[in-house]
Amino acid sequence: MNCSPPGSCTDTERQRSGTPATPCATLAPTHPLRQANRLPIRRIKMLTAHTGHLLHPEYLQPLSSTPISPIELDAKKSPLALLAQTCSQIGKPDPPPSSKLNSVTSSEKESGRSSSLKLGESPLEDKSSFKPYAKGGETRKESGSSAGGAADKAGFRVPSGSCQPFPHAPSPSSRVSSPGQHCESKNNESQEKKEPEVNKSSLETSQANPTLTRASISNSSAESSQSGDVAPSSKSDPPSLGSGHVAPISPYKPGHSVFPLPPSGIGYHGSIVGAYAGYPSQYVPGLDHTKSSLVGNQLPGTLGLPGKPPSSSPLTGASPPSFMQGLCRDPYCLSYHNASHLGSSSCSTCVHDPSALKSGYPLVYPSHPLHSVHTTLSSSVTPSLSGHPLYTYGFMLQNDPVPHICNWVSASGPCDKRFATSEELLAHLRTHTALPGADKLLAGYPTGLGSAASCHLHLPPTGPGSPNTLPGSLSLRSPHTFGLSRYHPYGKGHLTAPNGLPVPSLPAGSYYSPYALYGQRLTSASALGYQ
């Protein structure tokens, strides 16, 4: 018998039963008639459940670009909807401001603005103008009249293809009203080069940010207070470049007066003269005295450089990279920077003019790929110098009263003390090598050879008959066969030198190298590009 679920019994039920009809509502809940007509609870929940908690298909799909979306409307209430909205926008280009949130959040903000922004720009105004992925045409096109308003923006300026070169005459619109900043228009040969130059409107950043001056000279802050115009005839000062001037990519390109050297008031002593004299001419084209006075107007003629005292080093100043590579920190290198013995030791201005030196003082400056010493020493130095075992510099003086110089390099710099004889120098070197057990090592060296030769030049004995004579071909490094006589802790007991002479059994053998004591510093210096 069927009964309508919530209502009373029907007439057909009364006729079939033949009994007085009893309403279904009056039946007990446990009556079999009511239990047979009940719907399962599962179906009731599926029919009457609120569908707002189900997962919307918009969560599983990328957010459409419709102006109003249910997620966007619910983003203010539900954090999950806000997260879904944020995740769906990852990787998408920024839409124009009139499309997405115009009718919801930014209608009053964007009403006063023009909606003609490009696709790659954000709706709100970006205070930082550094756009690394911006195209060339998307950089801000600001005129000279709005230069003062945008001068307080911090950030970088990306040079675009639409940047115009420096004008040949200064105009009022090209001036910048920012204090401490003068954009100087150059009327020299650097205008015609095809170097990327920054637009005048992109030079509005203040001088307080040092990274904004892309490749300007280091003293541009001191020169920014000068007058704007620099004529080619008034080149007595170093070239006063504006802080926004883009230096050429190669500082050695001919025709440029831009050269990263200190002004003429800061000179170098004799070693940089040797570097200038030893390098090919194509490395120093910008040092012409008609173009710049960085080294003074004396360099092409006399190579005279006033300035620093002899104790100073050119490594302390700014130098071109090729000169820094030529200035070797190795005391055995031919271009070692300590060249104070080129002139008299009491010179005050240290003007090392090669014409002022004696003609008997040969200056041996090899070419930059350092050749062996004997190619220069055998031809230019008298045989008396070959008896100086501790003097391995490339430039040697014949009449020097104290020819022996301690070339020990420590953390504070080279020692550079002078001695008349090699014995005094050896005694002085023992003060540097005062390590535990070092006196025992030095005492056991072959006395006939002289510990100076084995200590510094790494030269094996020439024979039992002539122990004090050195080979004619001096070498800066030891021969490749002499390294076989080093002490090997697990090898055979007594090793012999290459010439067959037995060497006393010492913990260091017959090979005592000063490089073992400061070799780590030399390798770090060579890694820095000094060697």
Curated annotation (Swiss-Prot):
Gene Ontology biological process: adherens junction assembly; negative regulation of DNA-templated transcription; negative regulation of homotypic cell-cell adhesion; positive regulation of cell migration; regulation of canonical Wnt signaling pathway; regulation of cell cycle; regulation of transforming growth factor beta receptor signaling pathway
UniProt cross-references to Gene3D superfamilies, sorted A to Z: Classic Zinc Finger
Location of the region described as Disordered in the Swiss-Prot/TrEMBL record: 1-28, 88-249, 295-318
GO cellular component, one term: cytoplasm
Comp. bias intervals (Low complexity): 19-28, 113-122, 216-227
Changes seen on gene knockout: Morpholino knockdown blocks differentiation of the neural plate border (NPB).
Biased composition (Polar residues): 1-10, 171-180, 199-215
Zinc finger regions, C2H2-type: 404-432
Cellular localization per UniProt: Nucleus; Cytoplasm
Keyword entries, A-Z: Cytoplasm, Developmental protein, Metal-binding, Nucleus, Repressor, Transcription, Transcription regulation, Zinc, Zinc-finger
GO MF annotations, alphabetized: zinc ion binding
Basic and acidic residues compositional bias, start-end: 183-198
Function per UniProt: Transcriptional corepressor which does not bind directly to DNA and may regulate transcription through recruitment of histone deacetylases to gene promoters. Regulates cell adhesion, migration and proliferation. Involved in specification of the lateral neural plate border (NPB). May be required for segmental gene expression during hindbrain development.
UniProt-listed PANTHER family: ZINC FINGER PROTEIN 703, ZINC-FINGER PROTEIN NOLZ1-RELATED
Homology family: Belongs to the Elbow/Noc family.
Protein name: Zinc finger protein 703-B
Source organism of this protein record: Xenopus laevis
